[in-house]
């Protein structure tokens, strides 16, 4: 176990690299690995959210140079999600319930990585503000409870519903994850959480991975084969968490 723990910064670097290439922060990947190592939710959630903040920030900056943020739609989306993520982070759940919810979210992330939701470009039609608020609210509460940023749910929804194109989806997801993760961390701070040095080391590694991955995703072709390998790992981790 100690040997595996020593490789965690490298593992988180690689996860951040892959996720940031599609505008995500990587929380579901970090949580899957920590879940396999039987870490407690009190460590898993804040660690994933903190890494999410820095990786999604870099991804947003990268993708903002190749796409434009639909401001009205995004404001409505985040108006629902940020308060929900804040209060969701303060909801106490048992270890068993947490792992089962997390397992389901990780399986969704795995399906997303396989390219299942990669639909062709279509005419973009932004939904009404109240729909965006309700979507944000629903994703935000799950985000706060589990410690994910919500991008693994939002991205496929944007593409399937035709609310954004591929690059724009990455841009929207990155900022959505960034703000939700900050909101979740603030909610956890209300319960007395303070990050330890180990989590800070992981965050630095993830940040570096995000720098590389977001550049690849915004300027080059995404590393498709590596994403499929990661998807297999996530499927295994998600099923394991659900069955525990």
Give, region by region, the residue ranges found by the protein language model:
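Helix-loop boundary and gating motifs at the non-cytosolic
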Residues: 27-28, 151
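Structural signal for alpha-helical transmembrane segments and their flanking helix-loop junctions
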Residues: 133-187
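Membrane-interface alpha-helices at helix entry/exit sites of multi-pass transporters
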Residues: 40-50, 72, 163-174
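Residue-level micro-sites within transmembrane alpha helices that shape
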Residues: 15, 51, 111, 146, ...
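Juxtamembrane transmembrane-helix boundary motif
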Residues: 1-20, 29-37, 41, 58-142, ...
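Transmembrane alpha-helices of multi-pass small-molecule transport proteins
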Residues: 47-62
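Short hydrophobic/aromatic, small-residue-rich stretches within specific transmembrane helices
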Residues: 48-52, 173-177, 198-203
